[in-house]
């Protein structure tokens, strides 16, 4: 009747409500037509006899059960009246069996009625199979508890349809099998056991399927975040350690034993050339493994040239104009090509810039030579101190890594 009233109200428009007498008439009509409509629906229900071969107008047990399950939500009446209507749909052996059951249990409700029908007329083999599949459903290796619960729910619904469990026992059966067949944290297991113990006589208050899934998912997310955090793979750690961003730039040491003139070129289209002069007659530079001893004593600036490199990896040794250059192998690995820098070359004989002692053609007096030499030594001393600071920082960073 409520649907009829709403339809009539919508047809007349929101601004023109029905008069009170119309509402009263429709209520009376609804009270009169209600039993008639229920009786018509009852007459349209199929019959079930329980015989092996259904007669004309009868249905198999599966079709009868599907029809009853569909109409039960529309039956707003006491349990006794529902059972009475269900009895009217039975014929033959099915009616006799349920009459005996009802005589033995006068307080029989609809749920117990349907459960008894499933046990008697349903396929007994399917009931046993459904129950066996449910109790033998356990968590597989590597399977998350949340996925196991979803797989378990399928078997539980099959068992309920086969009459193994009543609908009101679903939460209890689900929770019990979860504790038996799943691996979970100690905290979650304790909470679920406590719920099962507290609500042993009130299974409807136990968490249903969706609530149980939510509890398990929260526990899994907490474990992933705090107990089993994702660790970077070894290859990622090595790549991060080798990244130029996380490394500082140690000095590149070039010994004078290899070449006289070093030409450093950044790119093919760079027109500037840096020429670095190194004295060839000086002793070779000590190896990089003797870093502390190298810092502990004075080294002539004619023996070593220190260049600040922007990166310590994959720097290629510079090519020499005389063709005698070789790769500089040290503790820092294969070095990248150094960036170009301007270095002023002084002649130790005359003190002028732009040429070396071997190519010097100037003849100056000894006083001027010594004065120029003192100036050159002062400049090189400042360069040496700077080189020691840079080399010390590079040694410290290499020890940290």
Swiss-Prot record:
Residues 270-282 have a biased composition (Acidic residues). InterPro entries: PNMA (IPR026523), PNMA_C (IPR048270), Znf_CCHC (IPR001878). The keyword S-adenosyl-L-methionine does not apply. A zinc finger (CCHC-type) spans 345-362. GO terms for cellular component: nuclear speck; nucleus; PML body. Residues 1-20, 270-292 are annotated as: Disordered. It comes from the Eukaryota. One of its GO terms (molecular function) is zinc ion binding. Keywords: Metal-binding, Transcription, Transcription regulation, Zinc, Zinc-finger. GO terms for biological process: BMP signaling pathway; positive regulation of transcription by RNA polymerase II. Belongs to the ZCCHC12 family. Transcriptional coactivator in the bone morphogenetic protein (BMP)-signaling pathway. It positively modulates BMP signaling by interacting with SMAD1 and associating with CBP in the transcription complex. It contributes to the BMP-induced enhancement of cholinergic-neuron-specific gene expression. This is Zinc finger CCHC domain-containing protein 12. It comes from Rattus norvegicus.
């Amino acid at each position: 009747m409520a649907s009829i009233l709403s339809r009539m109200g919508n047809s007349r428009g929101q601004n023109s409500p029905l008069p009170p007498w119309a509402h009263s008439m429709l209520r009376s009509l609804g009270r009169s037509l209600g039993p008639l409509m229920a009786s018509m629906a009852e007459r349209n229900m199929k019959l079930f006899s329980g015989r092996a071969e259904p007669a004309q107008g009868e249905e198999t047990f599966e079709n009868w059960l599907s029809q009853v399950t569909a109409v039960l939500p529309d039956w707003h009446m006491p349990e006794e009246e529902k059972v009475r209507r269900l009895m009217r749909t039975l014929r033959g052996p099915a009616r006799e069996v349920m009459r005996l059951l009802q005589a033995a249990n006068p307080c029989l409700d609809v749920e117990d009625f349907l459960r008894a029908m499933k046990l008697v007329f349903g396929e007994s083999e399917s009931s046993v199979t459904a129950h066996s599949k449910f109790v033998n459903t356990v968590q597989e290796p590597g399977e998350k508890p949340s996925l196991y619960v979803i797989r378990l729910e399928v078997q539980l619904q099959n068992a309920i349809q086969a009459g193994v469990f009543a609908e009101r026992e679903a939460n209890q059966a689900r929770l019990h099998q979860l504790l038996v067949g799943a691996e979970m944290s100690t905290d979650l297991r304790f909470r679920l056991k406590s719920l099962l113990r507290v609500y042993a006589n009130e299974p409807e208050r136990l968490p249903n399927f969706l609530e149980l899934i939510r509890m398990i998912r929260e526990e899994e997310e907490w474990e992933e975040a705090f107990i089993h955090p994702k660790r970077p793979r070894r290859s990622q750690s090595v790549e991060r350690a080798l990244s130029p961003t996380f490394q500082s730039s140690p000095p590149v040491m070039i010994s004078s034993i290899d070449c006289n003139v070093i030409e450093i070129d950044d790119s093919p289209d760079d027109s500037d050339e840096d020429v670095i002069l190194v004295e060839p007659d000086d002793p070779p530079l000590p190896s990089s493994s003797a870093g502390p001893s190298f810092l502990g004593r004075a080294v002539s600036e004619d023996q070593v040239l220190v260049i600040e490199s922007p990166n310590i990896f994959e720097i290629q040794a510079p090519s020499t104009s005389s063709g005698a250059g070789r790769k500089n192998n040290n503790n820092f690995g294969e070095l990248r090509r150094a960036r170009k820098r301007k270095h002023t070359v002084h002649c130790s004989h005359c003190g002028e810039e732009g040429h070396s002692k071997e190519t010097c053609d100037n003849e100056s007096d000894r006083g001027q030579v010594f004065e120029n030499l003192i100036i050159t030594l002062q400049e090189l001393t400042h360069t040496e101190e700077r080189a020691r600071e840079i080399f010390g920082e590079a040694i410290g960073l290499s020890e940290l890594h």
